[in-house]
Amino acid sequence: MRKIITIGREFGSRGRELGRRLSEDLGFAYYDQEIISEIAKRTSMSEQYVQSIVESKPSFSFPIHVSSSFYQMSDPMYDHAMAVYQKQTLIIEEMAARSNCIIVGRCADYILRDRHPLRIFVYADMESKLRRCREKAPEDEKLTDKELRQKILDIDKIRAKYYEFYTGEPWGNKLNFDMCLNTTNVSIKELAAAVAKLYES
């Protein structure tokens, strides 16, 4: 059985950075945006369109885990969303079978639940997330603190809706994770080293 770590994260909490550091420390493959690229290759959709689907709040009334019988009507957006999620599931399962790996986001903790991955959720306080977003923002982005705070909240709300729609589980629920890490004022390099040491012990 391959060793797998999944990372869910709040926007701006440096979950991606932690994932990359862990992959270097453990020698594991790292998957994030690579999943989007692979979905695009296997469908007729562009990467930008696939990205827009996975970053959009589902507009359907019932979560997908309830029953597909609710969606007998023809709805192109629904069909595309389902096609993307099905490809995403297949690709994540293939990646997990191929080698030891770290997968960020994409409902990977749920998709791979039968493989018993180490499930990590990363969070931080709002001030820390604001600082991180400022550091990573394009030079031409001129958001006030209030606007940026709202952007962070909106992105996390979309992530929660997406996760809950496809899994039927609440996003970020600590009971669904093996490790919840607060990255506020923490060195990601040191945190990754500590997690890697704990994981290998």
Where are these regions (language model features)?
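Glycine-rich phosphate-binding P-loop
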Residues: 6-20
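Short beta-strand-centered segment that lines the nucleotide-binding/catalytic pocket of NTP-utilizing
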Residues: 29-40
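ATP-dependent small-molecule kinase phosphotransfer cores
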Residues: 40-100
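Small-molecule kinase domains that catalyze NTP-dependent phosphoryl transfer to phosphate-bearing small molecules
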Residues: 60-65, 142-188
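Short, amphipathic alpha-helical "lid/cap" segments that border enzyme active or binding sites
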Residues: 89, 188-196
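Short, polar loop motifs at secondary-structure junctions
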Residues: 105-109
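Conserved phosphate-donor/acceptor-positioning beta-strand/loop module used by diverse small-molecule
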Residues: 114-135, 143-153
